[in-house]
UniProtKB/Swiss-Prot annotation:
Belongs to the DNA mismatch repair MutL/HexB family. The keyword Transcription does not apply. Transmembrane segments: none annotated. It holds the Pfam family Mlh1_C. Keywords: DNA damage, DNA repair, Nucleus. This is Putative MutL protein homolog 1. GO terms for molecular function: ATP binding; ATP hydrolysis activity; ATP-dependent DNA damage sensor activity; mismatched DNA binding. The gene is mlh1. It comes from Schizosaccharomyces pombe (strain 972 / ATCC 24843). This protein is involved in the repair of mismatches in DNA.
Length: 684
């Protein structure tokens, strides 16, 4: 080649430089969204909304409620290397913000048409600006490029339209809007999990419902459950590594890790370092090696980690998109994390599950095996669940005559005595000899906002794992009638449950769902409300008893219509609610039911408080009483077992929603499992 014909070296045009740089930073819509979310977080936003069209290729928009952008800063907003985050290179060692180069918005403006609407809290109106190739441009032909006043709320709205309109090769490579939307959804989910103090919404243009909506009221664990489902959330364990637990000064880590029983299609690592979403190949490999010691081949894991270290130990100026960072003592940090991970996995080693092994066909059956579409699967007997909650019990197959000969019917149970120091003997005897008539009334339709609100509270308080255990359990038997403990099996686990506390939630939820449609137990001998009140509260203050009686008499229409509690004008109780014809409450608790309706327990003048308080009192009235050691004879225990097996536990399985409080108080507690029992007895 002729030397003179060679192209000469010359500096590139600034516009070409900017487009090349933009291609490095903004590879796809996902990168633009990441940069804009981080800008919103830097601005102190507590609410971030993402709007997308065609996966962000035609339109992407970020709306936040942050501090906003000053009017004087708008001309420099999309100019390269213009930033408010640092003044000199040494500031990188003390960086507390996400942005620092001043390249994100500049890069977006070189490959898209950018519109910004922003307002400070002190401004009387918002400002609207349009940018092309890093500079202000007129919003419409003939207009001034200067920002224009407009209506708007505090914060900033940044819209980028027609992404890569001037980079045809990149635009032709990104044709799948659904794939881009999926990537952005995953990105927003990760930021939402980490920033639990910020609300995130992600929505497609034209959709009425957001594809992702996570409130700032949700904790990190709740957001993981919402995004990945209860199956993933139930296998997560807290991870915490304080500053004193590592040899690295100023280093700490927290998050969630999956236990040895976790299984999913693929592993998932969400890593934040100093609140930056980053990738670390070294840390990922270290985690995989640690999990490999405890998991079977092909198993997966879920890890969310937030690492915090001194800014001086972190180098964020490594990659154009800032997804890769370098930090000091990376080996020591990885070792500390993996050691802690190993400790947690060892403690949860009993939760490990093993894959089912396909049976290897013999040589003689090879041809048959090849032609078969399904392979025989072997289940190890220490993991073989031999029970099914849908199976009929042996007792249900026996005749009624046989059951009557073996034990008395639960409906004829002798009423226990009221154990109260100040009890009234005549009233107590009336309760003991109480005769009732069952009346089931036709259903009414009652539509109250307070009841809907209480029903919503029950649903929002649901503990998914505990509810699944109750929904799919197999009743085993009564353990301790004195402490109201029974045993159930769920899959390979054996659990003990406090059926007393669970009964309260069952009957309270029945009160809510059947509100205004209860049956009646009509008392053949009406009881004095004053006498019932005095059994619990004593008869020293007659004025309180009379005042309470007048209150119930004045509310007798409401009590009758809503709760099937019948009170005469003379202050006599003639009927109490019947929640189920298959179950009779312990009528010796009637004094406590009446006493629980006093104004000291709830506000009679507030509709929601009043209805809720009465339903709670009815639920407590229906809870089965514990049997004392003196009363624990064969007859009483058989009657209780019949009640548990034939009514209560089938109802737990059918309709109860277990609140988080019950699980936290260990009212449902796993005591062993089939693999553990097999290790002891070598048979199941």
């Amino acid at each position: 080649m002729d030397v003179n014909s060679r192209a000469k070296i010359r500096p590139l045009d600034q516009l070409v430089i900017n487009k090349i740089a933009a291609g490095e930073i903004i590879e796809r819509p996902e990168n633009a969204i990441k940069e804009l979310i981080e800008n919103s977080l830097d601005a102190g936003s507590t609410s971030i909304d993402v709007l997308l069209k065609d996966g962000g290729l035609k339109l992407l928009q970020i709306t936040d409620n942050g501090s906003g952008i000053q009017y004087d800063d708008l001309p420099y907003l999309c100019q390269r290397f213009s930033t408010s985050k640092i003044d000199n290179f040494n500031d990188l060692q003390h960086l507390q913000t996400f942005g620092f180069r001043g390249e994100a918005l500049a890069s977006i403006s070189h490959v898209a048409k950018v519109t910004v609407v922003t307002k400070l809290s002190s401004d009387i109106h918002a400002w609207k600006a349009f940018y092309v190739d890093g500079a202000l441009a007129p919003i419409s032909p003939g207009m001034s490029p200067a920002p224009q006043p407009c209506a708007g709320k505090q914060g900033t709205v940044i819209t980028a339209e027609d992404l890569f309109y001037n980079v045809r090769s990149r635009k032709s490579a990104l044709k799948n809007g659904s794939e881009e939307f999926r990537r952005i959804m995953i990105l927003v989910q990760k930021y939402a999990i980490h920033n639990d103090q910020v609300s995130f919404n992600c929505k497609k243009v034209g959709d009425t419902v957001a594809s992702l909506s996570l409130s700032s009221r949700l904790s990190k664990a709740d957001k993981i459950r919402h995004i990945y489902g209860p199956r993933v959330a139930s296998h997560l364990r807290d991870f915490s590594l304080g500053e004193g637990q590592s040899s690295i000064v100023g280093f700490s880590a927290n998050g969630f890790i999956s236990n040895a029983d976790f299984q999913d299609k693929k592993s998932n690592l969400i890593l934040f370092i100093n609140n930056r979403l980053v990738e670390s190949v070294e840390l990922r490999h270290a985690l995989e090696e640690t999990y490999a010691k405890y998991l079977h081949k092909g198993a997966s894991y879920f890890v969310y980690l937030s690492l915090n270290m001194s800014p001086e130990q972190l180098d964020v100026n490594v990659h154009p998109s800032k997804r890769i960072v370098h930090f000091l003592y990376d080996q020591e940090i990885a070792t500390s994390i993996c050691d802690k991970l190993g400790e947690i996995l060892e403690r949860t080693d009993t939760e490990r599950s093993y894959p089912l092994q396909a049976m290897i066909p013999s040589i003689s059956n090879t041809k048959n095996a090849e032609s078969s579409s399904q392979k025989a699967v072997r289940t190890y007997e220490n993991y073989l669940v031999r029970t099914d909650p849908r199976e009929r019990s042996i007792k249900s197959m026996l005749s009624d005559n046989f059951l009557q000969r073996s034990s008395n019917n639960y409906d004829n149970e002798i009423i226990e005595k009221v154990d109260s120091a100040n009890s009234n003997k005549n009233a107590t005897n009336d309760i003991k000899d109480l005769q009732t008539e069952e009346i089931v009334e036709e259903g009414n339709s009652i539509d109250l906002e307070s009841i809907k609100s209480l029903q919503k509270q029950v649903i929002n308080s649901m503990h998914v794992l505990a509810t699944n255990i109750l929904t799919e359990h197999k009743y085993v038997g009564l353990v301790c009638p004195t402490r109201r403990i029974a045993a159930v099996q769920h899959n390979i686990g054996l659990y003990v449950v406090d059926y007393g506390k669970l009964s309260y939630h069952l009957f309270y939820q029945i009160c809510l769902t059947e509100f205004g449609n209860y049956g009646e137990f009509v008392l053949e001998t009406p009881l004095s409300i004053s006498d019932l009140f005095e059994i619990v509260n004593g008869d020293e203050d007659k004025s309180e008893s009379e005042k309470f009686t007048r209150l119930l008499v004045s509310r007798r229409d409401m009590l009758k219509d809503y709760f099937s509690i019948s009170v005469t004008s003379g202050g006599l109780l003639t009927a109490v609610p019947m929640l189920s014809p298959k179950y009779h409450p312990p009528f010796e608790q009637l004094p406590l039911l009446i006493s629980s309706l006093t104004p000291k327990f709830f506000d009679w003048l507030d509709e929601k408080s009043c209805l809720n308080g009465i339903m709670k009192a009815i639920a407590k009235f229906y809870v089965p009483l514990p049997l004392s050691y003196e009363e624990s004879d064969v007859k009483s225990i058989r009657s209780l077992e019949s009640c548990l097996e034939d009514y209560l536990f089938p109802e737990f399985r059918r309709r109860v929603i277990c609140p988080k409080k019950v699980f936290e108080e260990k009212c449902i507690y796993q005591i062993t499992s089939l693999p553990r029992l097999y290790n002891v007895f070598e048979r199941c």
